[in-house]
């Protein structure tokens, strides 16, 4: 692996808006950034590069802040919060739905003691059926009660609810959501696409997709799903009934290979603003600041 020579992150105080400004650096993708001032945590995905904390400099409110640590994610050490969003609509087909539950159950068996799981289901209704658990038995017990028998798919509302819950949670070293769905929203008037896009624009949580290739969803709906994932700085994966476990393993490898970067601003003053923006090499990432 080659070492990163220059990695500059710029944090700018904003009123909840992202700004497209480039900074210097190499091929690094920022997936998550959060703050509980004076502490800041950043998740960084690299293209086969090493990151050392000496390589990382942050500019916070006009002041230079050096990283105190930059480590590869370690489930035995770093805290992780994961939201699983599971589509209960009949359009998912039983085989795809069963594969999704098996993926989540396998994750629970191997997640480590520092991971907290939330499970949100959506069909004609949206429900948080698991409100933060580290108990694999509890997670699998809840999964066993679920079936894909609902008409309608409140896809947008489920994503918004996950981000709303995230906003109330303490900062974690890593946080992301995984949506198991074919990606179509049949329910209008509850939460709109624009509302979700606006929420993503003010959120720091990446959304990853496990899209079921059922063949029932239009190219337009798949495009909407893909754009929401990209806007959140997540990534879309597509699975069939034959390869769901392998595809989900790839997603887990992607998230587990990230660097966890910590920095300390030296004070907890942020002028009463609840949102910060992270500007870096190629794309903006929101930094959620907890007062």
Task: Kindly label every feature range from the protein language model.
Residues 8-16:
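Bacterial N-terminal signal peptides
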Residues 23, 28-83, 88-97:
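Acidic, polar low-complexity linker/tail segments
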Residues 56, 87, 100, 119-122, ...:
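DG-centered beta-turn motif at the end of beta-strands
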Residues 75-131, 137-180, 211-221, 246-247:
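Von Willebrand factor
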Residues 181-231, 248-251:
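VWA/integrin I-like adhesion module and closely mimicked acidic/polar interface patches used
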Residues 220-221, 228-276:
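C-terminal helix of von Willebrand factor
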Residues 280-291:
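Single conserved hydrophobic/aromatic residue that forms the stacking wall/gate
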């Amino acid at each position: 692996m080659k070492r990163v020579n220059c990695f500059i992150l710029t944090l700018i105080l904003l009123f909840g808006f992202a700004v497209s400004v480039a900074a210097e650096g190499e091929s690094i993708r920022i997936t998550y950034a959060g703050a509980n001032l004076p502490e800041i945590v950043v998740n960084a995905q690299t293209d086969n590069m090493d990151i050392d904390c000496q390589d990382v400099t942050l500019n916070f409110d006009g002041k230079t802040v050096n990283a105190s640590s930059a480590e590869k994610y370690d489930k035995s050490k770093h805290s992780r919060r994961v939201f699983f969003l599971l589509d209960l609509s009949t359009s998912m087909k039983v085989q795809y739905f069963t594969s999704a539950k098996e993926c989540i159950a396998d994750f629970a068996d191997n997640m480590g003691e520092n991971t907290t799981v939330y499970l949100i289901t959506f069909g004609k209704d949206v429900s948080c059926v698991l409100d933060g658990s580290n108990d694999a038995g509890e997670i699998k017990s809840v999964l066993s009660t679920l079936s894909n028998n609902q008409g309608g798919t409140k896809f947008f509302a489920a994503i918004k609810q996950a981000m709303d819950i995230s906003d109330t949670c303490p900062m974690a070293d890593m946080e992301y959501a995984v949506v198991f769905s074919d990606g179509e929203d049949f329910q209008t008037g509850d939460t709109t696409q624009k509302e979700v896009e606006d929420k993503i624009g003010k959120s720091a949580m990446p959304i990853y997709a496990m899209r079921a290739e059922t063949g029932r969803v239009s190219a337009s709906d798949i495009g909407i799903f893909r754009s929401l994932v990209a806007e959140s700085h997540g990534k879309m994966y597509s699975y069939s009934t034959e390869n769901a476990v392998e595809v989900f393993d790839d997603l887990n490898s992607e998230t587990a290979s990230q660097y966890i970067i910590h920095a300390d601003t030296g004070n907890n003053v942020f002028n009463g603003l609840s949102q910060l923006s992270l500007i870096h090499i190629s794309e903006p990432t929101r930094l959620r600041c907890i007062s």
